[in-house]
Protein backbone atom coordinates (compact mmCIF):
# COMPACT_ATOMS: atom_id res chain seq x y z
CA UNK A 1 0.00 0.00 0.00
CA UNK A 2 2.86 2.39 0.81
CA UNK A 3 4.34 1.80 -2.66
CA UNK A 4 1.05 2.65 -4.37
CA UNK A 5 0.45 5.77 -2.28
CA UNK A 6 4.02 7.01 -2.70
CA UNK A 7 3.91 6.44 -6.47
CA UNK A 8 0.55 8.15 -6.95
CA UNK A 9 1.61 11.10 -4.80
CA UNK A 10 4.93 11.49 -6.63
CA UNK A 11 3.37 11.29 -10.09
CA UNK A 12 0.59 13.70 -9.11
CA UNK A 13 3.08 16.28 -7.82
CA UNK A 14 5.28 16.03 -10.92
CA UNK A 15 2.34 16.25 -13.33
CA UNK A 16 0.74 19.20 -11.54
CA UNK A 17 4.04 21.11 -11.44
CA UNK A 18 4.78 20.38 -15.11
CA UNK A 19 1.34 21.41 -16.34
CA UNK A 20 1.30 24.38 -13.98
CA UNK A 21 4.34 25.63 -15.88
CA UNK A 22 2.47 25.54 -19.18
CA UNK A 23 -0.65 27.05 -17.59
CA UNK A 24 1.10 29.89 -15.75
CA UNK A 25 3.13 31.10 -18.73
CA UNK A 26 0.14 30.74 -21.06
CA UNK A 27 -1.89 33.00 -18.78
CA UNK A 28 1.07 35.38 -18.50
CA UNK A 29 1.19 35.57 -22.31
CA UNK A 30 -2.55 36.25 -22.53
CA UNK A 31 -3.53 32.87 -23.99
CA UNK A 32 -6.95 31.50 -23.05
CA UNK A 33 -6.71 28.15 -21.25
CA UNK A 34 -9.69 25.85 -21.81
CA UNK A 35 -8.72 22.87 -19.66
CA UNK A 36 -6.15 21.83 -17.04
CA UNK A 37 -6.19 18.04 -16.71
CA UNK A 38 -4.29 15.70 -14.42
CA UNK A 39 -4.41 12.21 -15.90
CA UNK A 40 -6.07 10.75 -18.98
CA UNK A 41 -9.21 8.73 -19.67
CA UNK A 42 -12.46 8.85 -17.72
CA UNK A 43 -13.05 12.09 -15.83
CA UNK A 44 -13.36 11.46 -12.08
CA UNK A 45 -13.64 15.08 -10.97
CA UNK A 46 -14.50 18.24 -12.87
CA UNK A 47 -14.70 21.85 -11.79
CA UNK A 48 -15.19 24.97 -13.89
CA UNK A 49 -13.31 28.06 -12.80
CA UNK A 50 -15.13 31.26 -11.90
CA UNK A 51 -12.93 33.55 -13.98
CA UNK A 52 -13.92 34.96 -17.36
CA UNK A 53 -12.07 32.15 -19.19
CA UNK A 54 -14.17 29.45 -17.44
CA UNK A 55 -11.16 27.11 -17.39
CA UNK A 56 -12.15 23.48 -16.78
CA UNK A 57 -10.13 21.65 -14.10
CA UNK A 58 -10.30 17.84 -14.33
CA UNK A 59 -8.89 14.78 -12.60
CA UNK A 60 -8.91 11.63 -14.75
CA UNK A 61 -8.64 7.91 -14.09
CA UNK A 62 -5.18 7.18 -15.55
CA UNK A 63 -2.64 9.23 -13.53
CA UNK A 64 0.28 8.81 -15.94
CA UNK A 65 0.31 12.27 -17.46
CA UNK A 66 -1.69 15.41 -17.95
CA UNK A 67 -2.25 18.28 -20.32
CA UNK A 68 -3.22 21.93 -20.64
CA UNK A 69 -5.62 22.65 -23.51
CA UNK A 70 -5.34 26.15 -24.92
CA UNK A 71 -7.60 27.95 -27.36
CA UNK A 72 -6.33 27.55 -30.92
CA UNK A 73 -3.61 25.08 -29.93
CA UNK A 74 -4.62 22.40 -32.44
CA UNK A 75 -6.32 22.24 -35.81
CA UNK A 76 -10.07 22.81 -35.63
CA UNK A 77 -12.87 20.97 -37.41
CA UNK A 78 -15.25 23.62 -38.84
CA UNK A 79 -18.17 21.16 -38.82
CA UNK A 80 -17.68 20.05 -35.22
CA UNK A 81 -15.93 22.88 -33.38
CA UNK A 82 -17.75 26.15 -32.76
CA UNK A 83 -16.17 29.21 -34.38
CA UNK A 84 -13.84 31.27 -32.24
CA UNK A 85 -15.38 34.64 -31.34
CA UNK A 86 -13.50 37.52 -32.99
CA UNK A 87 -12.66 39.04 -29.61
CA UNK A 88 -10.88 35.78 -28.60
CA UNK A 89 -8.72 35.46 -31.71
CA UNK A 90 -5.83 37.50 -30.21
CA UNK A 91 -5.87 35.07 -27.25
CA UNK A 92 -5.46 31.88 -29.29
CA UNK A 93 -2.21 29.96 -29.00
CA UNK A 94 -1.52 29.86 -32.73
CA UNK A 95 -1.86 33.65 -33.03
CA UNK A 96 1.00 34.23 -30.56
CA UNK A 97 4.47 35.20 -31.78
CA UNK A 98 6.95 32.34 -31.87
CA UNK A 99 8.82 33.48 -28.75
CA UNK A 100 5.64 33.30 -26.66
CA UNK A 101 4.76 29.84 -27.96
CA UNK A 102 8.32 28.75 -27.21
CA UNK A 103 8.08 30.10 -23.66
CA UNK A 104 4.72 28.41 -23.01
CA UNK A 105 5.93 25.00 -24.17
CA UNK A 106 9.33 25.26 -22.46
CA UNK A 107 7.73 26.25 -19.15
CA UNK A 108 6.65 22.68 -18.33
CA UNK A 109 10.15 21.17 -18.23
CA UNK A 110 11.54 24.37 -16.68
CA UNK A 111 9.08 24.06 -13.79
CA UNK A 112 10.25 20.46 -13.27
CA UNK A 113 13.83 21.68 -12.99
CA UNK A 114 12.76 24.46 -10.62
CA UNK A 115 10.95 21.92 -8.43
CA UNK A 116 14.08 19.76 -8.32
CA UNK A 117 16.22 22.77 -7.39
CA UNK A 118 13.82 23.66 -4.57
CA UNK A 119 13.80 20.09 -3.23
CA UNK A 120 17.57 19.64 -3.42
CA UNK A 121 18.04 23.03 -1.75
CA UNK A 122 15.68 21.99 1.06
CA UNK A 123 17.64 18.78 1.62
CA UNK A 124 20.97 20.62 1.62
CA UNK A 125 19.66 23.25 4.04
CA UNK A 126 18.12 20.74 6.49
CA UNK A 127 21.15 18.48 6.22
CA UNK A 128 21.64 14.82 7.05
CA UNK A 129 24.07 12.51 8.81
CA UNK A 130 26.37 11.32 6.01
CA UNK A 131 29.19 8.75 6.13
CA UNK A 132 32.56 10.49 5.88
CA UNK A 133 34.77 9.40 2.95
CA UNK A 134 37.39 7.65 5.13
CA UNK A 135 38.63 4.50 3.41
CA UNK A 136 39.18 1.03 4.72
CA UNK A 137 41.92 -1.22 3.33
CA UNK A 138 41.13 -2.11 -0.32
CA UNK A 139 41.11 -5.76 -1.43
CA UNK A 140 44.49 -6.94 -2.80
CA UNK A 141 44.70 -6.60 -6.57
CA UNK A 142 41.74 -4.23 -6.81
CA UNK A 143 41.83 -0.98 -8.79
CA UNK A 144 42.00 0.93 -5.50
CA UNK A 145 44.91 -1.19 -4.23
CA UNK A 146 46.81 -0.75 -7.50
CA UNK A 147 46.36 3.02 -7.14
CA UNK A 148 48.00 2.82 -3.67
CA UNK A 149 44.92 3.85 -1.69
CA UNK A 150 45.33 2.84 1.94
CA UNK A 151 43.32 2.31 5.10
CA UNK A 152 42.35 5.57 6.85
CA UNK A 153 42.91 7.67 3.70
CA UNK A 154 40.28 10.42 3.56
CA UNK A 155 39.05 11.42 0.09
CA UNK A 156 39.09 15.22 -0.19
CA UNK A 157 38.45 15.75 -3.94
CA UNK A 158 37.60 13.78 -7.09
CA UNK A 159 37.96 14.82 -10.72
CA UNK A 160 39.05 13.60 -14.15
CA UNK A 161 41.57 14.63 -16.79
CA UNK A 162 38.87 16.87 -18.31
CA UNK A 163 37.45 18.19 -15.04
CA UNK A 164 39.51 19.59 -12.17
CA UNK A 165 39.06 17.73 -8.87
CA UNK A 166 36.14 19.16 -6.88
CA UNK A 167 35.89 18.85 -3.09
CA UNK A 168 33.82 16.04 -1.60
CA UNK A 169 32.34 16.06 1.87
CA UNK A 170 30.47 12.76 2.08
CA UNK A 171 30.71 9.21 0.80
CA UNK A 172 27.75 9.83 -1.52
CA UNK A 173 29.79 12.54 -3.28
CA UNK A 174 32.61 10.06 -3.96
CA UNK A 175 30.15 7.49 -5.28
CA UNK A 176 28.54 9.98 -7.68
CA UNK A 177 31.86 11.33 -8.99
CA UNK A 178 33.17 7.83 -9.73
CA UNK A 179 29.86 6.89 -11.33
CA UNK A 180 30.12 9.93 -13.62
CA UNK A 181 33.74 9.17 -14.51
CA UNK A 182 32.85 5.56 -15.35
CA UNK A 183 29.94 6.65 -17.55
CA UNK A 184 32.26 9.03 -19.39
CA UNK A 185 34.93 6.35 -19.86
CA UNK A 186 37.54 8.45 -18.03
CA UNK A 187 40.06 7.80 -15.28
CA UNK A 188 39.27 9.32 -11.90
CA UNK A 189 41.79 11.68 -10.29
CA UNK A 190 41.42 11.29 -6.51
CA UNK A 191 43.03 13.52 -3.90
CA UNK A 192 43.33 11.94 -0.45
CA UNK A 193 44.71 12.88 2.95
CA UNK A 194 46.52 10.01 4.65
CA UNK A 195 46.45 9.06 8.32
CA UNK A 196 49.70 11.04 8.72
CA UNK A 197 48.04 14.20 7.38
CA UNK A 198 49.99 14.23 4.11
CA UNK A 199 47.99 14.75 0.92
CA UNK A 200 48.61 12.90 -2.31
CA UNK A 201 46.88 12.37 -5.65
CA UNK A 202 46.15 8.96 -7.19
CA UNK A 203 44.61 7.83 -10.47
CA UNK A 204 41.88 5.18 -10.64
CA UNK A 205 42.15 3.56 -14.07
CA UNK A 206 39.72 1.44 -16.08
CA UNK A 207 36.65 2.36 -14.07
CA UNK A 208 33.64 0.13 -14.75
CA UNK A 209 30.67 1.83 -16.40
CA UNK A 210 27.22 1.44 -14.87
CA UNK A 211 25.83 2.43 -18.29
CA UNK A 212 26.77 -0.99 -19.68
CA UNK A 213 25.26 -2.84 -16.73
CA UNK A 214 22.88 -0.84 -14.47
CA UNK A 215 23.34 -3.33 -11.64
CA UNK A 216 27.10 -2.81 -11.39
CA UNK A 217 28.31 -1.22 -8.16
CA UNK A 218 31.18 1.01 -9.26
CA UNK A 219 32.46 1.46 -5.70
CA UNK A 220 32.57 -2.29 -5.08
CA UNK A 221 34.19 -3.02 -8.44
CA UNK A 222 36.91 -0.44 -7.79
CA UNK A 223 37.57 -1.85 -4.33
CA UNK A 224 36.72 1.23 -2.31
CA UNK A 225 35.10 0.69 1.06
CA UNK A 226 34.42 2.77 4.12
CA UNK A 227 36.49 2.34 7.26
CA UNK A 228 34.04 0.60 9.55
CA UNK A 229 33.69 -1.05 12.91
CA UNK A 230 32.71 -4.67 13.60
CA UNK A 231 30.15 -6.36 11.34
CA UNK A 232 27.02 -7.21 13.31
CA UNK A 233 23.63 -8.79 12.63
CA UNK A 234 20.89 -6.15 12.48
CA UNK A 235 18.03 -8.51 11.63
CA UNK A 236 17.49 -12.19 10.81
CA UNK A 237 14.72 -13.05 8.37
CA UNK A 238 12.25 -15.74 9.51
CA UNK A 239 12.83 -19.11 7.85
CA UNK A 240 16.20 -18.05 6.44
CA UNK A 241 19.51 -19.90 6.46
CA UNK A 242 20.71 -17.49 9.13
CA UNK A 243 17.79 -18.31 11.43
CA UNK A 244 18.29 -22.04 10.97
CA UNK A 245 21.97 -21.60 11.86
CA UNK A 246 21.02 -19.86 15.11
CA UNK A 247 22.11 -16.30 14.30
CA UNK A 248 20.54 -13.58 16.44
CA UNK A 249 20.26 -9.85 16.27
CA UNK A 250 23.36 -8.21 17.78
CA UNK A 251 25.74 -11.07 16.99
CA UNK A 252 29.17 -9.82 15.89
CA UNK A 253 30.58 -11.75 12.93
CA UNK A 254 34.30 -12.39 13.36
CA UNK A 255 35.07 -14.91 10.62
CA UNK A 256 33.19 -16.53 7.75
CA UNK A 257 34.41 -19.80 6.24
CA UNK A 258 37.76 -19.22 7.96
CA UNK A 259 38.26 -15.70 6.59
CA UNK A 260 38.31 -12.58 8.80
CA UNK A 261 35.05 -10.65 8.33
CA UNK A 262 36.34 -7.09 8.66
CA UNK A 263 34.08 -5.61 5.96
CA UNK A 264 30.38 -6.17 5.38
CA UNK A 265 30.98 -5.90 1.62
CA UNK A 266 33.51 -8.76 1.74
CA UNK A 267 31.12 -10.90 3.74
CA UNK A 268 28.31 -10.28 1.25
CA UNK A 269 30.58 -11.21 -1.65
CA UNK A 270 31.68 -14.47 0.02
CA UNK A 271 28.10 -15.45 0.82
CA UNK A 272 26.95 -14.79 -2.75
CA UNK A 273 29.75 -16.99 -4.09
CA UNK A 274 28.52 -20.03 -2.09
CA UNK A 275 24.91 -20.83 -3.06
CA UNK A 276 23.53 -23.91 -1.27
CA UNK A 277 26.93 -24.67 0.30
CA UNK A 278 27.99 -25.35 3.88
CA UNK A 279 30.12 -22.84 5.79
CA UNK A 280 31.05 -21.88 9.34
CA UNK A 281 30.44 -18.51 10.99
CA UNK A 282 32.53 -17.44 13.98
CA UNK A 283 30.67 -14.90 16.10
CA UNK A 284 30.83 -13.05 19.39
CA UNK A 285 27.58 -13.12 21.38
CA UNK A 286 27.59 -11.08 24.58
CA UNK A 287 31.38 -11.24 24.46
CA UNK A 288 31.50 -15.04 24.18
CA UNK A 289 33.00 -16.67 21.04
CA UNK A 290 30.85 -19.20 19.18
CA UNK A 291 31.07 -21.12 15.90
CA UNK A 292 27.84 -21.81 13.99
CA UNK A 293 27.54 -24.15 10.98
CA UNK A 294 25.28 -22.80 8.23
CA UNK A 295 23.79 -24.15 5.03
CA UNK A 296 23.40 -21.14 2.73
CA UNK A 297 20.32 -20.63 0.62
CA UNK A 298 20.22 -19.49 -3.01
CA UNK A 299 18.54 -16.69 -4.91
CA UNK A 300 18.38 -15.44 -8.52
CA UNK A 301 20.96 -12.90 -9.69
CA UNK A 302 19.12 -9.76 -10.83
CA UNK A 303 22.26 -8.58 -12.65
CA UNK A 304 22.49 -11.80 -14.67
CA UNK A 305 19.03 -13.19 -15.50
CA UNK A 306 19.23 -16.89 -16.19
CA UNK A 307 22.75 -17.12 -14.80
CA UNK A 308 24.05 -18.95 -11.72
CA UNK A 309 22.22 -18.35 -8.47
CA UNK A 310 23.72 -16.39 -5.59
CA UNK A 311 24.20 -17.55 -2.04
CA UNK A 312 21.82 -16.10 0.55
CA UNK A 313 22.16 -15.91 4.34
CA UNK A 314 18.90 -14.10 5.02
CA UNK A 315 20.34 -11.67 7.55
CA UNK A 316 20.68 -7.90 7.42
CA UNK A 317 24.22 -6.78 8.23
CA UNK A 318 25.25 -3.61 10.01
CA UNK A 319 28.64 -1.94 10.27
CA UNK A 320 29.18 1.34 12.08
CA UNK A 321 30.95 4.06 10.10
CA UNK A 322 31.91 7.59 11.10
CA UNK A 323 29.28 10.14 10.09
CA UNK A 324 28.87 13.90 10.21
CA UNK A 325 25.95 16.30 9.80
CA UNK A 326 26.36 17.77 6.31
CA UNK A 327 24.28 20.90 5.73
CA UNK A 328 24.51 24.26 3.95
CA UNK A 329 23.35 27.78 4.61
CA UNK A 330 20.38 28.80 2.39
CA UNK A 331 22.44 30.58 -0.29
CA UNK A 332 24.98 27.76 -0.52
CA UNK A 333 22.16 25.21 -0.47
CA UNK A 334 20.64 26.87 -3.53
CA UNK A 335 23.96 26.77 -5.36
CA UNK A 336 24.43 23.12 -4.41
CA UNK A 337 20.93 22.33 -5.70
CA UNK A 338 21.53 24.03 -9.05
CA UNK A 339 24.79 22.11 -9.54
CA UNK A 340 23.07 18.86 -8.60
CA UNK A 341 20.30 19.41 -11.17
CA UNK A 342 22.87 20.26 -13.85
CA UNK A 343 25.04 17.21 -13.11
CA UNK A 344 22.04 14.87 -13.03
CA UNK A 345 20.71 16.28 -16.31
CA UNK A 346 24.06 15.91 -18.07
CA UNK A 347 24.49 12.39 -16.71
CA UNK A 348 21.03 11.40 -17.99
CA UNK A 349 21.83 12.75 -21.45
CA UNK A 350 25.18 10.93 -21.52
CA UNK A 351 23.56 7.61 -20.66
CA UNK A 352 20.81 8.19 -23.23
CA UNK A 353 23.35 9.07 -25.90
CA UNK A 354 25.35 5.93 -25.15
CA UNK A 355 22.18 3.82 -25.38
CA UNK A 356 21.45 5.28 -28.83
CA UNK A 357 24.90 4.36 -30.17
CA UNK A 358 24.93 0.96 -28.46
CA UNK A 359 27.52 1.78 -25.79
CA UNK A 360 25.07 1.43 -22.90
CA UNK A 361 22.62 -1.27 -21.92
CA UNK A 362 18.95 -0.77 -22.74
CA UNK A 363 18.28 -2.08 -19.23
CA UNK A 364 18.90 1.50 -18.10
CA UNK A 365 15.35 2.26 -19.25
CA UNK A 366 12.80 1.97 -16.46
CA UNK A 367 9.03 2.23 -16.58
CA UNK A 368 6.25 2.94 -14.09
CA UNK A 369 6.63 -0.37 -12.24
CA UNK A 370 10.27 0.29 -11.36
CA UNK A 371 9.52 3.93 -10.53
CA UNK A 372 6.71 2.80 -8.22
CA UNK A 373 9.04 0.30 -6.53
CA UNK A 374 11.67 3.00 -5.94
CA UNK A 375 8.98 5.39 -4.67
CA UNK A 376 7.86 2.87 -2.07
CA UNK A 377 11.42 2.07 -0.97
CA UNK A 378 12.32 5.75 -0.72
CA UNK A 379 9.19 6.52 1.31
CA UNK A 380 9.95 3.65 3.71
CA UNK A 381 13.38 5.18 4.43
CA UNK A 382 11.94 8.53 5.54
CA UNK A 383 10.89 11.90 4.17
CA UNK A 384 14.39 12.96 3.12
CA UNK A 385 14.89 9.87 0.95
CA UNK A 386 11.47 10.41 -0.63
CA UNK A 387 12.17 14.08 -1.33
CA UNK A 388 15.50 13.13 -2.95
CA UNK A 389 13.66 10.56 -5.08
CA UNK A 390 11.07 13.16 -6.07
CA UNK A 391 13.81 15.61 -7.09
CA UNK A 392 15.59 12.96 -9.17
CA UNK A 393 12.41 11.96 -11.02
CA UNK A 394 11.56 15.62 -11.58
CA UNK A 395 14.93 16.15 -13.29
CA UNK A 396 14.41 13.01 -15.38
CA UNK A 397 10.96 14.21 -16.44
CA UNK A 398 12.35 17.61 -17.41
CA UNK A 399 15.14 16.05 -19.48
CA UNK A 400 12.76 13.59 -21.14
CA UNK A 401 10.33 16.30 -22.19
CA UNK A 402 13.10 18.42 -23.71
CA UNK A 403 14.21 15.66 -26.08
CA UNK A 404 13.65 16.80 -29.70
CA UNK A 405 11.04 14.13 -30.37
CA UNK A 406 7.68 15.10 -31.91
CA UNK A 407 4.76 14.78 -29.43
CA UNK A 408 7.13 15.80 -26.61
CA UNK A 409 7.70 19.41 -25.59
CA UNK A 410 11.18 19.25 -27.09
CA UNK A 411 9.75 18.37 -30.50
CA UNK A 412 7.54 21.46 -30.49
CA UNK A 413 10.47 23.60 -29.36
CA UNK A 414 12.45 22.30 -32.34
CA UNK A 415 9.61 23.37 -34.65
CA UNK A 416 9.64 26.85 -33.14
CA UNK A 417 13.42 27.11 -33.59
CA UNK A 418 13.01 26.26 -37.27
CA UNK A 419 10.22 28.83 -37.57
CA UNK A 420 12.33 31.47 -35.85
CA UNK A 421 15.29 30.84 -38.19
CA UNK A 422 13.33 30.55 -41.44
CA UNK A 423 10.45 32.89 -40.70
CA UNK A 424 7.97 30.15 -41.67
CA UNK A 425 6.31 27.45 -39.57
CA UNK A 426 7.07 23.80 -40.28
CA UNK A 427 4.45 22.62 -42.83
CA UNK A 428 1.55 20.73 -41.27
CA UNK A 429 2.15 17.80 -43.64
CA UNK A 430 5.69 17.46 -42.27
CA UNK A 431 4.44 17.79 -38.71
CA UNK A 432 1.89 15.01 -39.29
CA UNK A 433 4.58 12.63 -40.59
CA UNK A 434 7.04 13.52 -37.83
CA UNK A 435 4.31 13.10 -35.21
CA UNK A 436 3.66 9.54 -36.36
CA UNK A 437 7.38 8.81 -36.16
CA UNK A 438 7.52 10.38 -32.69
CA UNK A 439 4.56 8.33 -31.47
CA UNK A 440 6.20 5.17 -32.80
CA UNK A 441 9.44 6.02 -30.96
CA UNK A 442 7.60 6.73 -27.70
CA UNK A 443 5.62 3.48 -27.97
CA UNK A 444 8.82 1.55 -28.66
CA UNK A 445 10.62 3.07 -25.67
CA UNK A 446 7.57 2.56 -23.44
CA UNK A 447 7.31 -1.09 -24.47
CA UNK A 448 11.01 -1.62 -23.80
CA UNK A 449 10.75 0.08 -20.40
CA UNK A 450 7.76 -2.08 -19.45
CA UNK A 451 9.63 -5.19 -20.61
CA UNK A 452 12.55 -4.24 -18.36
CA UNK A 453 10.13 -3.61 -15.49
CA UNK A 454 8.43 -6.98 -15.87
CA UNK A 455 11.76 -8.79 -16.26
CA UNK A 456 12.98 -7.29 -12.97
CA UNK A 457 9.66 -8.08 -11.29
CA UNK A 458 9.54 -11.74 -12.33
CA UNK A 459 13.24 -12.20 -11.57
CA UNK A 460 12.79 -10.75 -8.09
CA UNK A 461 10.01 -13.24 -7.39
CA UNK A 462 11.90 -16.21 -8.78
Curated annotation (Swiss-Prot):
Keyword Nucleotide-binding carried by entry: no
Transmembrane portions of the chain: 1-21, 102-124, 386-406, 430-450
Chain positions recorded as Zn(2+) binding sites: 18, 22
Cofactor: Zn(2+)
UniProt xrefs under SUPFAM superfamilies: PDZ domain-like
PROSITE patterns found in the cross-reference section: PDZ (PS50106), ZINC_PROTEASE (PS00142)
One Gene Ontology CC term in the entry: plasma membrane
UniProt name for this protein: Putative zinc metalloprotease RSc1411
Amino acid sequence: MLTVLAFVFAIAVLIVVHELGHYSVARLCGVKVLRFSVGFGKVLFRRVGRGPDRTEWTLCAIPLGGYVKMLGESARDPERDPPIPPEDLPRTFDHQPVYKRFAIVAAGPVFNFLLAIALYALLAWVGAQEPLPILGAPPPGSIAAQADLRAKDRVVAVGTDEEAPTPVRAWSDVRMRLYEAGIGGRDAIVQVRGADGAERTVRLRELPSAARSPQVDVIEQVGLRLLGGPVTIAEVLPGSAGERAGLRRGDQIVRFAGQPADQASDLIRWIRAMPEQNASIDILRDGLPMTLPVRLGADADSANPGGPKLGKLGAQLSQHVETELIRDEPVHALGHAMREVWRTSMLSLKVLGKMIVGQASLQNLSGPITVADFAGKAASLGWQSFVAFLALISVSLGVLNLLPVPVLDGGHLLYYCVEFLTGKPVPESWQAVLQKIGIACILLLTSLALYNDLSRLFLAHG
